Amino acid sequence: MDNKFNFTKSCYIFFYLNPYIRISSNIYTLILMNKEFEQISLKPGFMKHNGGLLFKSISENEYQFKTTITENHLNAAGIVHGGYISAVVDAGAGTAAHRASNGSPCVTISLELKFISAIKLGQELVGITKIQKKTKSMVFLTCELKSSNKIVATASGVWKILKLSGAGPGG
């Protein structure tokens, strides 16, 4: 019996049979797919101040984020303020652009948002972001926000991939 460690076989078992890791067919880039949400608003800033944002990767081109609505997010009419919805989309979709760009910092170039329905106190707001196209310097994406399994807003945007280091997601 041969007791030698078989590196190739071990890599195959770990990378190809592990459901949390995907390998792109032409590029040997590993992308970790999270089954659970993670808090992305860890640094002091706007999103952390406003309750944070949970995020997870679904696939190489699809990401999900969520938050629960509190009194701080409401406007005078008792529904979620449009500015807060915009900030949530910007942070969630921006994190998707960051992840799709192999961790490079990204900044919003344009963001178009359409408000469809009101969101109320205590509801969970869930966003699904899909990368439509990625170039060396830009990420084009769309986003759909849902609450109680109903679409409440849609968005599309463009993010610039910066050539900086040290920046993180979730502002």
Segments (PLM) and residue ranges:
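Extreme N-terminal basic, low-complexity initiation segments
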Residues: 1-10
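Terminal targeting signals and extreme-terminal segments of soluble enzymes
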Residues: 12-13, 17-21, 27-171
